[in-house]
Amino acid sequence: MTTLTISIIVVFVLGYALIATESLTKVNKAAIALLMLVGCWTLYMMDPMQYLQLMHPDYTGGAAGMVEKVTGIIQEHLGDTATTLFFLMGAMTIVEIVDQNGGFNWVRKVMKTKSKRALLWRIAFLTFVLSAILDNLTTSIVMIMILRKLVTDHKDRMVYASLVIIAANSGGAFSPIGDVTTIMLWNKGLITAAGVIAEIFIPSVVSMVIPALILQTMLKGELVMPEVSAQQNASVSDFTEGQRKAVFWLGVGGLIFVPIFKSITHLPPFVGILLVLGVLWTATEVFYRGLHRGTDAEGTQKRVTKLLSRVDMSTILFFLGILMAVSCLAEIGVLTALGQGLNVVFDGNHYLVTGIIGVLSSIVDNVPLVAGCMGMYPVAAAGDMAVDGIFWQLLAYCAGVGGSMLIIGSAAGVVVMGLEKITFGWYMKHISWIAFVGYIAGIVCYWFIRTFLYAI
């Protein structure tokens, strides 16, 4: 391993450490990710020929065509990254449109009950389902806002909020559009929508149901329902009830339609998400036509042109930085060597490899972990490493569900931590072991299905 290769690895590891300790450094992880991107590729360009000879042995252009070749490599990686970024931007915008225009109002009505345990199960399954359709971050925000209207006791709400984290991560693991990591794997063609839903659905349910069974022992009695003011009920007044339902079904139904669109047209998933965004945008413009005409009413601030500014661009830039930095590691051969090393150490046991990756995803960000694995292991024509093979499906499950073990291990956990003021220590003491039990139970369930049911 050359000094230059070691330098690139040091830049990546240092950046990774700063991202993992964002809560301590108070430096936004997107800024660090962008610096990682630039730092890694700048070092790469100091002597790209050694890496071209290593990773592209068919290259014969010599020094004269070196810059052009490297530029093409970077553009190819950027193209792959852009498909994920456009998908995320489209999905985030769609959810923002539905939320801001009252599309989720019906959820609060569905959740109403006096029994604490009944509410827990409604929260668990609704969060699970919504997270499979939306992203787990948005689902968590929506569910916490609903919980605040239903549960007044903060101690009880922390238990419910913890279940929201677990259910959101479990629900996102089996859906090709439910979590950033599954989006990455699906977008890359490593898993299919039908395959991951069919084989990861039951383990995901198990990883949510078992923690819910344990958590319900912490809740007894009935809820004291808070009063809902007329002003709160009238928070969304621009659209009629029918129009709000139309916005919901166009948005959420459209997200469900994306995998179907991909299977019919064979176009990348981001094309389907842009189709849904275009249709939903057009529909809301038609609904707003004639409303607040000639005025500066507050409702016009909910039009898509205004809502676009609310999309979290720092998240998009974070993924750009991470994915492009990981692509640099792939181009210097580090990921291939690491993947071979893991196979040797664990003797090719994919359950152990992915299980450890899942535990690591609760400590550090799962996006670079999954991106790294995508670069470490080539897709095989058949076997465990083939499309929809054991390794890729387990990676989708472990990277998603594993993030529940620590409150900082997932985007859902971080946002709930901030909204409900749950401390790292409280979650680790009361919830982490419960999430771990569910995580292991899901892996065992997957092993049982693959070993015994598939053998019949």
Predicted regions and their residues:
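Juxtamembrane and boundary regions of transmembrane helices in multi-pass small-molecule transporters
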Residues: L4-S7, D153-H154, M158, F174-S175, ...
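Hydrophobic mid-bilayer segments of alpha-helices in multi-pass membrane transport proteins
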Residues: I6-G15, K26-G62, T81-T93, R244-G254, ...
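Hydrophobic alpha-helical transmembrane segments
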Residues: I6-I9, L34-L35, L85, L120-F125, ...
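Transmembrane alpha-helix boundary signature
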Residues: L43-E76, M92-K109, V129-I141, C328, ...
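Transmembrane helical segments that form the transport core of multi-pass membrane transport proteins
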Residues: T60, G79, N101, R108-V110, ...
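Alpha-helical transmembrane segments
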Residues: G79-M89, G195-L213, T265-G278, L352, ...
